[in-house]
């Protein structure tokens, strides 16, 4: 089979990209990763992430508890109105109205923390993607013998893949919190006499607070693990067979 012919100018563009990627990776390891480890460690020590009494996180839930007598009278009037009113359209419009309590806001304390956390999630995933691409471009052509360095590359790549999967899950976790909290608030508004629904809203807030702290820890740890394992194996990762440069297989 004839060898693939690559135009010199095309190869030059790939080489420029490769060199730029190597420079960025070395800058990440040399300064950016240590800086992020320090910043996230400081974030974890802030009072905002060290609330001992989680009941302080409780957000106002402006859903009035109904008076049983008034509710009974209201229900009777509603039944009478439905008997008299045969207009299905009007009935449908009434059913679409929101709860009498008005809008219920998010938990501002949780939202403020998430506004700080989400850029960190985006950043660590992007940096991990960059370093993973750099590593893949160091993998040499497949051939027999002297594959210890390649095995090291594969182990590090497996670690990076696992980290990426975990970090990507944080976005879903945050969305799930808002979805579940919204459902709990809707149930509390629809059945305001059920105290469990009210308490469920507060329980979800407390659980999310704990998760936010854990996510910050995981991001810090991701930077630390990447920094440590790449630094310890840098020569093997960059030159698995002692070659001057890696080749894409």
From Swiss-Prot:
Residue spans of biased composition, Basic and acidic residues class: 68-98
The protein, known as: Proteasome activator complex subunit 1
Pfam families membership: PA28_C, PA28_N
Region (Disordered): 60-102
PANTHER family associated with the record: PROTEASOME ACTIVATOR COMPLEX SUBUNIT 1, PROTEASOME REGULATOR PA28
Function recorded in the entry: Implicated in immunoproteasome assembly and required for efficient antigen processing. The PA28 activator complex enhances the generation of class I binding peptides by altering the cleavage pattern of the proteasome.
Assigned GO CC terms: cytoplasm; nucleoplasm; proteasome activator complex
Domain of life: Eukaryota
Subunit and interaction comment: Heterodimer of PSME1 and PSME2, which forms a hexameric ring. PSME1 can form homoheptamers.
Assigned keywords, A-Z: Proteasome
Any one GO biological process: regulation of G1/S transition of mitotic cell cycle
Gene3D superfamilies: Proteasome activator pa28, C-terminal domain (1.20.120.180), Proteasome activator pa28, N-terminal domain (1.20.5.120)
GO MF, any single term: endopeptidase activator activity
Family (UniProt): Belongs to the PA28 family.
